[in-house]
């Protein structure tokens, strides 16, 4: 039986991969690792199988200055791994980001493969010197020369996948993903009013017919037609805790990067009291945790994890 199987962002979580901060700046490691350990403990307490990634190989190439730490994919595995149905995809990361090529990661992918999961890897970009222009305006930094996209550019809603065309994924990446997945799925390339990454900072599907939206990055014009009938919870203004250490590598909206454990239960940064209140007022229970250095390390609870298996089957959610 395939150990991989994910069809939506909200089906009950069964197995997840959690990143590691080891290898980041020393002053951040202990606190962040303790918080990630706490996340793992809470998830295990909810009956979820938890896997941990090893630290990134220090020989990996450095990331561009505005793309985060060199250890990006060990801490943020959702940048590089995407599960759609029973297929695990290694995505063609934006040039300059390291790839998940450690022996331990390969062994994990082999375990999923030998269980019956489909494992595919997108062609890694080769035009790295000209693909990414950090001096271009936000949303125009990726050129359309070959497919590139981070995995968290994609949100799964049954037979429909939202793909944010942005500085984390170009339109060719959406075309490659559609070709790789075939006719069972429809990939919707979306452009928002805010061109910077990532898709999971803009929209959070909470359950059938219910989404959390970032008011700065999503408006009615940029939502695919099939989502316009869904109830939208507008994310309130978030508390910006700022980076206690290190440079900023994510926006002040990182607090909306929440993890859905199952319909009606989400993991939220405990510092976001207004967001928790809004969710609870809409019938969503909240498990409050914290990633103190989230902005410095460019993350949130969704981005530091990869859901590998959720209970559910492939369905259409076009109401």
From Swiss-Prot:
Q: Does the keyword Transferase apply?
A: yes
Q: Which InterPro entries match?
A: AmidinoTrfase
Locate the compositionally biased regions of type Pro residues. 55-65
One function term, GO molecular function aspect: scyllo-inosamine-4-phosphate amidinotransferase activity
E.C. number(s) listed in UniProt: 2.1.4.2
Where in the chain is the site Corresponds to active site cysteine in strB1?
A: 303
Query: What are the protein's UniProt keywords?
Result: Antibiotic biosynthesis, Streptomycin biosynthesis, Transferase
| A single BP term in Gene Ontology | streptomycin biosynthetic process
Describe which pathway this protein belongs to, using the record's wording. Answer: Antibiotic biosynthesis; streptomycin biosynthesis
Q: Where is this region: Disordered?
A: 50-72
The free-text function statement in the UniProt record for this protein reads: It is not obvious if strB2 participates in streptomycin biosynthesis as an inosamine-phosphate amidinotransferase. The nucleophilic cysteine which is the key residue for amidine transfer is not conserved but replaced by an arginine residue.
Q: Give the family from UniProt.
A: Belongs to the amidinotransferase family.
**What is this protein's name?**
Putative inosamine-phosphate amidinotransferase 2
Originating organism? Streptomyces glaucescens
Name of the gene this protein is made from: strB2
